[in-house]
């Protein structure tokens, strides 16, 4: 009798696994979705489908349809595939720059209302079309799904403190906070490869500016809790020149210009933003940085405490200059990704509205103080 029950149980397990396998083979698992602006106020939607078929190495494909609404597109997309499209594996949503500039709230809200989609999926913008991005292949693995590649691309840059958080949850939280705006990474195709090239700044749900790559660090250090950031910074030789290592003539590397470049890693940032007590709308930004020196374009006597002291002063001055330039550049766009309005609301006006902050923000000023500590130089004592 026991043998019969063992045989029956085994048979049921095999049958169940076969049924589950057949069910999966009938599904089109959406790993990425992209939205572009089409003619006649239509929206073009492209999805990447992963077809569950262990016998086919590269079983992903893209499907495109146009409609006025996200759900309308879903219906049309289902008409173009033999698989039942499901969103439970969605990892990335991409919005074309032109579409984003007109507002993407309705499209983002639809994702948040779908119970099968988690709120930790990544959102991003592209200055190409979303369709172009999603029709690219993973350059590291021809059989990989492009949706998975894009997810990993964004994930490692976010976790590496290169870009601010681009999750669906974070976008909606910032969208509804008074005195703070969303920001999303921008994907571009360069030399046939997809990569992050800038940061898209929003005013409410509308894209207003693409912040250049060299400014993203300064935005990130103020808008996120940086634990292990990286950056390359150019410093004027000036007072550092007397601390240069004097190599043998045959080893001397000629370097043009008056700039020395330093790569810093494992950057930890501790920031404090306060509203200055005066009639002027001035924010006091205090930033403490701990950095490690990884590489220099010109060798310095880093074993000498006087060199470290001088280098720290120069770093403080340059960080302050770059931060202030970035903040005023961002302010010109009318976007507030750092959240100065939130600081104002907490410290000055608890009844602040988004409309009122839009009136106040353009007149705001910034005073930055930076205190850098070099915790490691790479020098072996």
Specify the residue positions occupied by each region the protein language model found.
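Membrane-proximal alpha-helical signals and transmembrane carboxylates
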Residues: 3-6, 13-381
